[in-house]
Amino acid sequence: MAKFIMVVGTSSNSGKTVLVAGICRILANKGYKVAPFKSQNMSLNSRVANEDGEIAVAQYTQSLASKVEPSIHFNPILLKPMGNFVSQVIVQGAPYKTINYNEYREDKEYYLTKIKESLEYLNKNYDFVVMEGAGSCCEINLLGDDIANLRIAELSNADAILVSDIDRGGVFASLYGTVELLPQKWKKLIKGFVINKFRGNAEVLIDGYKKIEELTNIPVLGTIPYSEELELPEEDSQALQNKKVFGNINSPVEVNVVRFSKISNFTDIDAFSKDALIKFIDFKEDITGDILILPGTRCSTVEMDLMKKYKMDKKIKDFAKKGGIVIGICGGYQTMGKMLIDDTHSEGDIGTIEGIGLFDMETYFGNKKAIVNSNGILSIKDDDFLVNGYELHEGITHSNEKPLIKLNKGFGNKNDGYDGSINIKDGNYLIGTYFHGIFDNYEFRNHIINMVLAEKGHKLITEDNYKDNFEKNINKFAEIIENNVNLEKIFKK
């Protein structure tokens, strides 16, 4: 039987995701088998779990923090926004329906049934389950339909922690207001408060601690100091709205990423963050980098239409002709071909549209979605690399180019044992693949970066700086939590 803990917040972006990851690492380091859990997540960033089903990237990252293999039961309900208030619903890893909010509400009892199934599975197979809420746990206009917060804590008899971000201001009012607005049956589940992102001397908060404890009869478990040095993955495309440039600002290598309107799985790019400067460019902007990445997208035909409208397709062709490295991932790969053929309009209203034309290939839409963890041998110049990735795509690609990867497992271009396309002759350096997570394979990533470094006369890299950086940061954050938050009572079974 597992002990259930839930982290809920006074608002979105209060620190729930990273706090769950940190608690998971603390417990894993103590030798416990730990599962992260989020009953319902809304995100365009997803990964493939062990069962070849989709879960949100946040729960995948939390599974890394937990030192366990990712499972579809860590995120039984995943909502992938498609625009116009419509989302694709993924249930225990598999596509279920594409519906609007009112239709979703009508299916609430079905989703609760699947959530309970996953909770039962976790209860039988783990020592601890550390659950994450969604947004604010007390949106009083939505409480009746909320299946992501304290209703789940009640179902699992979890001890709940309420976290609030003091960097936004009004932390004590947020804590007090949230607790007082909760129904009594859920209020009593809150066992402690955590104040996140505090700058300065925490002693100035002592009077506030005392007052909030007197008012609510709930203790403050601790305060997590703000740290600019911590580097943990972003969860969703919302994080891109205010992000233009990130990564290693001192690197001589610049990676440009086209900011697609329906960008998905942009966490593919994170792997470059230690060794390159990463810059997102809009359709109207010029390409200034050494490497151009066309990322994943929910709708390749829409992005292709927009690229034509703003002449981005021409800019990409010109960049490639000058020897620039162009890499397309999933939907971005599809746009690199001659044609995107959507006679059934499964991608939307646009239908069939010409691609950029970098590859001699065509992609046909309307097939069942491929959801699979994949691996194979990637061949580039004189190097062969064993690479792992995951596929989340509709579309079958017929390519006359040399394939990039000989598959051991996966769907690839058209379920024929090969994935991707590569053209590195006649001054071209064009790469496309359906593998999300391709850059997590450090030998391939370093190969791409080292091409630029060598051309500019810089020292080449040989280490896996990205993976090492994640482990270093999650362990550091776990240590910060242990040093500043009293969780022993929460951990007691």
Swiss-Prot record:
One of its GO terms (biological process) is cobalamin biosynthetic process. Disulfide bonds: none annotated. InterPro entries: Class_I_gatase-like (IPR029062), CobQ/CobB/MinD/ParA_Nub-bd_dom (IPR002586), CobQ_GATase1 (IPR033949), CobQ_N (IPR047045), CobQ_synth (IPR004459), GATase_3 (IPR011698), P-loop_NTPase (IPR027417). Keywords: Cobalamin biosynthesis, Glutamine amidotransferase. One of its GO terms (molecular function) is ABC-type vitamin B12 transporter activity. The active site is at C330 (nucleophile), H436. Pfam families: CbiA, GATase_3. Residues 252-444 form the GATase cobBQ-type domain. It comes from the Archaea. The keyword Mitochondrion does not apply. Pathway: Cofactor biosynthesis; adenosylcobalamin biosynthesis. SUPFAM superfamilies: Class I glutamine amidotransferase-like, P-loop containing nucleoside triphosphate hydrolases. Belongs to the CobB/CobQ family. CobQ subfamily. HAMAP family: CobQ. NCBIfam families: cobQ (TIGR00313), PRK00784.1 (NF001989). Catalyzes amidations at positions B, D, E, and G on adenosylcobyrinic A,C-diamide. NH(2) groups are provided by glutamine, and one molecule of ATP is hydrogenolyzed for each amidation. This is Probable cobyric acid synthase. It comes from Methanococcus aeolicus (strain ATCC BAA-1280 / DSM 17508 / OCM 812 / Nankai-3).
